[in-house]
Amino acid sequence: MRRHHLLGLLRRAAASSTSAASSRAGPHPSLHAPGPLRNGGSAPRFFSSRGGAGAASKGLGDDEVELYSLLLGVSIGDEGEASSRGPAASRGGRRGRNSKRQPPRSRFDGDGVGCSKDGKLSWGYSSFQGRRPSMEDRLSIKSTTVNGETVSLFGVFDGHGGPRAAEYLKKHLFKNLVKHPKFLKDTKLAINQTFLKTDADFLQSISSDRYRDDGSTAVAAILIGNRLYVANVGDSRAVALKAGKAVPLSEDHKPNKKDERKRIEDAGGIVVSDDIWRVDGILAVSRAFGNRLMKRYVKAEPNIQEKVVDEGLEYLVLATDGLWDVMRNEDAVSLLKAQDGPKAAAMKLTEVARSRLTLDNVTCIVLQFHHGKSTNSK
């Protein structure tokens, strides 16, 4: 898409908030104001869309709505409350050689907020592109009911070699998981099998060698009643604030770890370092979705932790490595304590990552557990 055409679409989107609504459903109706959903149902009463993509998309054609969805890279489930801010325009020019170093600017950033129907959980998310030439992070949020059980699912996906794998996970991972026949009875088994099957499905969907290097990490939180499951592949990370302390709930999959290196080498791969340890001198994570040429030893098998949600659990952060590259777990939870609600916390985390000159895309979701207190989803 040529730059002048892209700018034209954005200008039209900004100017069209009072136009008549398009007669055709956009590709992401769940980002719009309450109304008919793609599956034929109606948006629940607690679903709301305030401003941003929801308001600006009124009167847009399919291509403009698709543009908003692509820029934000956000998937919100049919039964989740969310609002999102539209993509920000590029700000600032190229930094001169002798100019003062400035934090990287983000061409496309988005943020949003939501809460569960029972009021026990609220969440906020924030993301920005940073210095990378493209945005390869994606996230997915879904709040639904399975056999009468309230289920909330959250995922952050960090693409590499292109956005295709992360986009596929955003669309399919949780859809596949809730359909697993043992999702409620043996959730850990269901998560493990769904991750592996979704990886196989993605590889089958990319027939062209053009996408053979597309891959993605993933970190997901699945809440079923008072049981919390955290699953991760790669180096996107989950960190909880519990009883005032940082508690890691995921394990970074790095090729220099003794067990991971042995597994890779036993399968025929090599691990080498050029300041960063890499599989076959290419990939800086030892597990990932996609990466077809390395699939023998770069698996999508997740580490899974199961926890009981008790009153000590206050917050949970899911974030891509663009955040963790410049922030310790303890720094992240300290920032959470000073913020007013999960959206403010998510935005603060990404702002600090940008101020610390992270070189990568950054996306994070912050969950706040209320334990009978009034919900604050700011």
From Swiss-Prot:
Q: Tell me the segments the record calls region Disordered.
A: 1-59, 79-115
Cited InterPro entries:
PP2C (IPR015655), PP2C_BS (IPR000222), PPM-type-like_dom_sf (IPR036457), PPM-type_phosphatase-like_dom (IPR001932)
Binding-site list for Mn(2+) 2: 158, 321, 360
The record, for PROSITE patterns, names: PPM_1, PPM_2
Superkingdom of this protein's organism: Eukaryota
Keyword annotations of the record: Hydrolase, Magnesium, Manganese, Metal-binding, Protein phosphatase
Query: Which positions in this protein are listed as binding Mn(2+) 1?
Result: 158-159
Q: Cofactor(s) for this protein?
A: Mg(2+); Mn(2+)
> Which reactions are catalysed by this chain?
O-phospho-L-seryl-[protein] + H2O = L-seryl-[protein] + phosphate; O-phospho-L-threonyl-[protein] + H2O = L-threonyl-[protein] + phosphate
UniProt signal peptide: none
Picking any one GO molecular function of the record gives: metal ion binding
Enzyme type, top EC level: hydrolase
- Compositional bias ranges of the Basic residues kind: 92-104
In this protein, which residues make up the domain named PPM-type phosphatase?
122-369
Biased-composition ranges, Low complexity, are 7-26
Question: EC number(s)?
Answer: 3.1.3.16
Read off the PANTHER family from this record. PROTEIN PHOSPHATASE
Similarity comment text for this entry: Belongs to the PP2C family.
Protein name in the entry: Probable protein phosphatase 2C 55
